[in-house]
Amino acid sequence: MIMTRKNILKAQRIVVKIGTSSLILPNGKINLSNIDELAFVLSDLNNKGYEVILVTSGAIGVGLNVLGMNKRPKGIADQQALASIGQVELMSLYTQMFRRYSQKVSQLLLTRDVTDFPTSRENPENALNALLALDIIPIINENDAIAVDEMDHQTKFGDNDKLGAIVSKLVHADLLIMLSDIDGLFDKNPTIYDDAKIFNEIHEITDELRQMAGGAGSRFGTGGMTSKLAAAQILFENDQEMVLTNGERIREIQQIIEGREIGTYFHQKF
């Protein structure tokens, strides 16, 4: 029996966050087929009347590809240079792919100091609302080329999972779909344990969940799940919802919006 997540059926304004692992192949090359498929699916949603915002990672990964480098440099200035180079190429790829489906896109690069304060926060909020009204799909990334935290001036979001949640909060999104390298949240690492079970729904971010998703000594042990729980917590505090799912199956986004039980659904109890 196919179950339906009925509350998702009401979603009209949707934020999709895609991570570097879904954009860059294991050999360091750009995953062109994934970007093309993403452009098709989001353009199709826009044609159907949904308001869509894309939060993307990948600037440094694409920068490495552009320069033919296979190792991320340790120096902050070198990483910023790569982000600057990669962001141009990344947006060029997105523009080309979306153009195939007659969809216009825009770019917005954010830093934490802009979204943390009510006065400055109004600017990206107003810009995003205006872009959506123009039938544009905004593409958002952190401004990695300039974002560096100092003692009294925080400019970095920390990761783009958090950025996806903050953007969802900013635009009062009905749903955040987070594309990852895993099918959802499991009770233990499914790449190691054959009996790992996926959580269909999560209603609260507990200390037990955080410990399970935490560092190298945890049962889970895969990087990035802690940041996804932190993003979910931001959404819970705003009475918003998120689905965590696999970025290798981008076409499932449509089924998720239709309420199909795919991935892990984070929402407060109805």
UniProtKB/Swiss-Prot annotation:
Q: Indicate which residues the UniProt annotation says bind substrate.
A: 57, 144, 160
Q: What is this protein called?
A: Glutamate 5-kinase
- Which organism was this protein described from? Lactococcus lactis subsp. cremoris (strain SK11)
Q: What superkingdom heads the lineage?
A: Bacteria
Per its record, the protein catalyses:
L-glutamate + ATP = L-glutamyl 5-phosphate + ADP
Q: Membrane: is it a keyword of this entry?
A: no
Q: In which residues is ATP bound?
A: 17, 180-181, 222-228
Pathway it works in: Amino-acid biosynthesis; L-proline biosynthesis; L-glutamate 5-semialdehyde from L-glutamate: step 1/2
Tell where it localizes.
Cytoplasm
Q: Which GO terms describe its biological process?
A: L-proline biosynthetic process
Keyword Translocase assigned to the entry: answer is no
